[in-house]
Each structure stands twice: as C-alpha cells, then as structure tokens.
Design a protein with these regions (language model features):
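Terminal-region recognition feature
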Residues: 1-138
Length: 138
C-alpha cells in the first residue's frame, strides 16, 4: 500500500509520506526495531496462536490471510529487550492483523507477559494501535 501521491520514500520517514503526510500502518517488528536497542530483542511466546472456539464461519481462512499478509500468527508480539540500556518487557499490537484486535491468544500473551512483572523491576511498555475485542472469539 502506498500513499495517494504514490511516493516511494515513506519507509525512510517511518511510514509517513514526506510528500502528502499520509501515515501508513507500522508493523510490530518494525516498531520494536525502532524502540529496542540493537541486538537486544528476544520474542516471548512466539508460538501462541488464536483459537477458533466458536467455529466462526471463514475465521480460519481470515486468520491464514492475515498471517500471510503480516508474517504474524497473531496481532500481538511480546518481547524483552533494552531501551536506552534499561531492560524492559514490551508488547506491540500490529494493526495490520485484524486491526490489532484482541483475541484469546493476545490475552494469553498478555497474561504471560504481565506474570513476569511482579518479580521484576523491569518497566512494561505496550503499544496499542488496536480496534478492540475480536468478535469471532467473543
């Protein structure tokens, strides 16, 4: 997807077109690469995936399409890394995957992530460009 002006330079300006000002979606891994110190990223729970507990029509196909489009299994990416030398737990919802909506997998990743904090002095930083709860898993 490109800005309406068809500029090719938007990646260098953090997904904001310098010609027309259109903001494009930033993926979770790109956002983490701009926030975490180089070489400190370690993903938490990369294998947690959504459940189709309600057997919602076409949900599996939509999940597969979102996965192909984004390279993600789920909207949430959770990680540990350093920001300015300070160890932190970071979570990012990727708005390109079901508009960053929250599923059972996002809840599970959040629980695992938050369960690390009581025994830690690490800050928790969450990026939430989300649309809310996912109706297919209500």
């Amino acid at each position: 997807m490109r800005p309406p002006c068809h500029a090719q330079v938007w990646v260098k300006s953090q997904y904001v077109c310098p010609n027309c000002g259109v903001h494009l979606a930033i993926g979770a891994y790109y956002r983490l690469s701009t926030v975490l110190d180089h070489g400190t990223f370690k993903e938490l729970n990369p294998d947690i995936a959504p459940n189709d507990v309600l057997h919602f029509p076409d949900y599996q196909e939509k999940l597969a399409a979102a996965s192909v489009k984004t390279g993600l299994k789920e909207a949430a990416v959770t990680a540990i890394g350093r920001i300015g030398g300070v160890q932190a737990v970071v979570a990012v919802l990727d708005s390109r995957f079901f508009m960053g909506s929250m599923s059972t997998a996002v809840g599970e990743k959040s629980h695992v992530r938050l369960s690390m904090l009581p025994t830690s002095t690490w800050p928790l930083i969450i990026f939430l460009p989300a649309a809310g709860a996912r109706m297919q898993e209500a």
